[in-house]
Amino acid sequence: MASSDKQTSPKPPPSPSPLRNSKFCQSNMRILISGGAGFIGSHLVDKLMENEKNEVIVADNYFTGSKDNLKKWIGHPRFELIRHDVTEPLLIEVDQIYHLACPASPIFYKYNPVKTIKTNVIGTLNMLGLAKRVGARILLTSTSEVYGDPLIHPQPESYWGNVNPIGVRSCYDEGKRVAETLMFDYHRQHGIEIRIARIFNTYGPRMNIDDGRVVSNFIAQALRGEALTVQKPGTQTRSFCYVSDMVDGLMRLMEGDDTGPINIGNPGEFTMVELAETVKELINPSIEIKMVENTPDDPRQRKPDITKAKEVLGWEPKVKLREGLPLMEEDFRLRLGVHKN
């Protein structure tokens, strides 16, 4: 084998910066969450703030996130909120970086596809540059979308995917694939400590009400008394993970020894018609279910193989769909001003 083809072992991780050692040498763990004002990010903040030795810094541009998700922590001495776009460098001192920043809903990433891919590529480069400078460990929330419209079911981490590189979803799908590449290149070339989570469909309180994702769509429609709009043919499947389970998986990955990628998701699989019927039964039995045209490149099936998460992280989801939907319904009722009869 030619020398240029040989596998190169990763360099040892860089030492923390002199500034980190001199100014912040203390027992507290300083943790940055990019996109921390968003749905999953804000729940991650809540969990990390339970540990009194954690100082949590959130950087968010509020494109899809909201200060309301973090209002309980604003003014807390161990919490800091920075209005910042990750496509610009960020100069702070931290020990860990959870890199969540990126629009994850088709409505948002199709609205500004160039911004979406810049966030995935330039934003990830900036977060990796920060990790390199300060010697921080960095976790990327990648996505099940890297598998595209999968030809293998369920999807293990070893599957390379079936992605359309020029479709309307490509800014997100391919952007996350590039972000994963950058993570491993920085790991191999610079010794950065990396973790990659491939997260599957997640639901729960604080989801954007009109973000175009199927669970939030159905619950909002049911509460408004509107027909549930199921994209044809309705037999396409998804797997839904409750947000508390997702946060638990991300934290276990960050604190563990495996770089990933590791699938984090609930392997319970439902067709879109089954999901609509469940939401109808639980929230508003009087509404109709209406079939509408599908969007291009919509995957026919999606289900995580979580064997690796079980073996490496000791993680598997606990909350069943019928347990999680009422918790999300309660949050949506409050925000929509719809009272139970």
Swiss-Prot record:
Residues 1-21 are annotated as: Disordered. One of its GO terms (molecular function) is NAD+ binding. Its cofactor is NAD(+). It catalyses: UDP-alpha-D-glucuronate + H(+) = UDP-alpha-D-xylose + CO2. Its EC number is 4.1.1.35. It comes from the Eukaryota. It is an enzyme of class 4 (lyase). It holds the Pfam family GDP_Man_Dehyd. NAD(+) binds at residues 60-85, 172-176, 213. It is found in: Cytoplasm. Pathway: Nucleotide-sugar biosynthesis; UDP-alpha-D-xylose biosynthesis; UDP-alpha-D-xylose from UDP-alpha-D-glucuronate: step 1/1. Belongs to the NAD(P)-dependent epimerase/dehydratase family. UDP-glucuronic acid decarboxylase subfamily. Catalyzes the NAD-dependent decarboxylation of UDP-glucuronic acid to UDP-xylose. Necessary for the biosynthesis of the core tetrasaccharide in glycosaminoglycan biosynthesis. This is UDP-glucuronic acid decarboxylase 5. The lineage of its organism: Eukaryota, Viridiplantae, Streptophyta, Embryophyta, Tracheophyta.
